[in-house]
From Swiss-Prot:
This is tRNA (guanine-N(1)-)-methyltransferase. Its main location: cytoplasm. Belongs to the RNA methyltransferase TrmD family. Specifically methylates guanosine-37 in various tRNAs. It comes from the Bacteria. It comes from Shewanella baltica (strain OS155 / ATCC BAA-1091). Keywords: Cytoplasm, Methyltransferase, S-adenosyl-L-methionine, Transferase, tRNA processing. Its EC number is 2.1.1.228.
Length: 248
């Protein structure tokens, strides 16, 4: 996957290129990330990248000319078919379904705003989609961009050691993940569930599915409203609720 990022702080993206899963993906040639800094497209000696908004009010906007030139440079490097995304609190909220959709694109250009945002005409003429990572205020679009890159890259074939790792992540099937355990078998008197030590793969599968269903019901019940549960899932969830009520 090819990624271009428009940002005033390109050094922040070393967190993507140099570390963890995404860093390995870059090293292995599965992920290609380039940055364009609007400051490199300024024409004054101060490298000005902000400007006052029409109509007054507090704060500044990103200056149109350097930002637009940076976007054009990224588009030229990406070639035809690149999707331009502006990270914005007004955009569609990112969820696993959205991540799956974005992962179908081979080339993405992410525009990271700063200050009070960017000129609306840039959004109208240069941006294909707006995406948000949540209903809260951040200082810029860099952290949302890194969040999007990390989540999307996990679905790029070969990035994870095993595709099952992505398939078993929370939200991959619309449910929260089940609990996980490692050694020791007993920790401060709390034992690993016996079924996980049984070696019975079918029973382990059913237990994990039931725990995912139950955890989703208890912590994010609204997620279940969007799912068409199978007969197996419905039965397992009913058994979970029954057991929970017995121990209430």
């Amino acid at each position: 996957m090819w990624l271009g990022v428009i940002t005033l702080f390109p050094e922040m993206f070393r967190a993507v290129t140099d570390f963890g899963v995404t860093g390995r993906a870059v090293k292995n040639g599965l992920l290609e990330l380039h940055t364009w800094n609007p400051r490199d497209f300024t024409h004054d000696r101060h490298n000005t990248v902000d400007d006052r908004p029409y109509g007054g009010g507090p704060g500044m906007l990103m200056m149109v000319q350097p930002l637009r030139d940076a976007i054009h440079a990224a588009k030229a490097a990406a070639g035809e078919g690149a999707k331009v995304i502006y990270l914005s609190p007004q955009g569609r909220k990112l969820d696993q379904q959205g991540v799956t959709e974005l992962a179908q694109s081979s080339r993405l250009i992410l525009v990271c705003g700063r200050y009070e945002g960017i000129d609306e005409r840039i959004i109208q003429t240069e941006v294909d989609e707006e995406w948000s990572i949540g209903d809260y205020v951040l200082s810029g679009g860099e952290l949302p961009a890194m969040t999007l890159i990390d989540s999307v890259s996990r679905l790029v074939p070969g990035v994870l050691g095993k595709q099952a790792s992505a398939e078993q992540d929370s939200f991959s099937d619309g449910l929260l993940d089940c609990p996980h355990y490692t050694r020791p078998e007993s920790l401060d008197g709390v034992d690993v569930p016996a079924v996980l030590l049984s070696g019975n793969h079918e029973q382990i599968r059913l237990w994990r599915l039931q725990q995912s269903l139950g955890r989703t019901l208890l912590r994010r019940p609204e997620l279940l409203q969007n799912l068409a549960l199978t007969d197996e899932q419905t039965t397992l969830l009913a058994q979970f609720v029954e057991a929970m009520n017995k121990h209430a």
